[in-house]
């Protein structure tokens, strides 16, 4: 990741921490990474139910963030989820995923790698903060 993206990456992590809706991820390691980052929002894993049921459950939170991985499968899942969620009265955030992908794709394959990248970024951007956050 380029140094000029460190601040924006940290802002996106803060956005995840402050999010109060439901976050949709692919699997348990993605959930663990988000919890390690301090995310307190409801996390719904795709590995448990059909997409139509996931969309219904997630929409009940009023606000939904799609955080699938950055590979072809993750892209396809994100597109399908967006289509399912269009039929529900909820706000869908797919932009956070797109921005994370844009600034971090060279460093990580997916959501499960966010925590490791975060630790790396804070140690490089401000070594005095390592271990504090």
From Swiss-Prot:
| Pfam short name (any one) | Toprim
Cofactor remark from the record:
Binds two Mg(2+) per subunit.
Cofactor(s) it depends on: Mg(2+)
Q: Which UniProt keywords apply?
A: Magnesium, Metal-binding
Q: Which residues form the Toprim domain?
A: 20-100
The answer, when asked if Metal-binding is one of the entry's keywords, is yes
For the ligand (Mg(2+) 1), the binding residues are 26, 69
InterPro entries named among the record's database cross-references = TOPRIM_dom, TOPRIM_RNase_M5-like, UPF0292
Q: Which domain of life is it from?
A: Archaea
Indicate the segments annotated as coiled coil, or none if absent.
none
* GO molecular function, a single term: metal ion binding
Q: Where along this sequence does the record place binding of Mg(2+) 2? A: 69, 71
Q: Does the keyword Metal-binding apply?
A: yes
What PROSITE patterns has UniProt attached to this entry? TOPRIM
Instruction: Note the CDD domains from the entry.
Output: TOPRIM_RNase_M5_like
Q: Which HAMAP family match?
A: UPF0292
| UniProt family annotation | Belongs to the UPF0292 family.
Record's protein name: UPF0292 protein TON_0187
Q: Which organism is it from?
A: Thermococcus onnurineus (strain NA1)
């Amino acid at each position: 990741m380029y140094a000029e993206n460190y601040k924006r990456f940290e802002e996106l992590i803060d956005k995840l921490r402050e999010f109060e809706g439901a976050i949709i991820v692919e699997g348990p390691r993605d959930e663990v990474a988000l919890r390690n980052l301090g995310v307190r929002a409801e996390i719904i894993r795709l590995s448990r139910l059909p997409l139509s049921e996931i969309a219904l459950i997630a929409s009940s939170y009023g606000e939904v963030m799609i955080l699938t991985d950055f590979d072809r499968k993750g892209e396809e899942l994100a597109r399908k989820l967006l289509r399912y969620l269009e039929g529900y009265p909820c706000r869908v955030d797919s932009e956070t995923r797109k921005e994370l992908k844009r600034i971090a794709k060279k460093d990580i394959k997916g959501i499960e790698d966010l925590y490791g990248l975060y630790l790396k970024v804070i140690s490089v951007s401000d070594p005095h903060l390592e271990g504090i956050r």
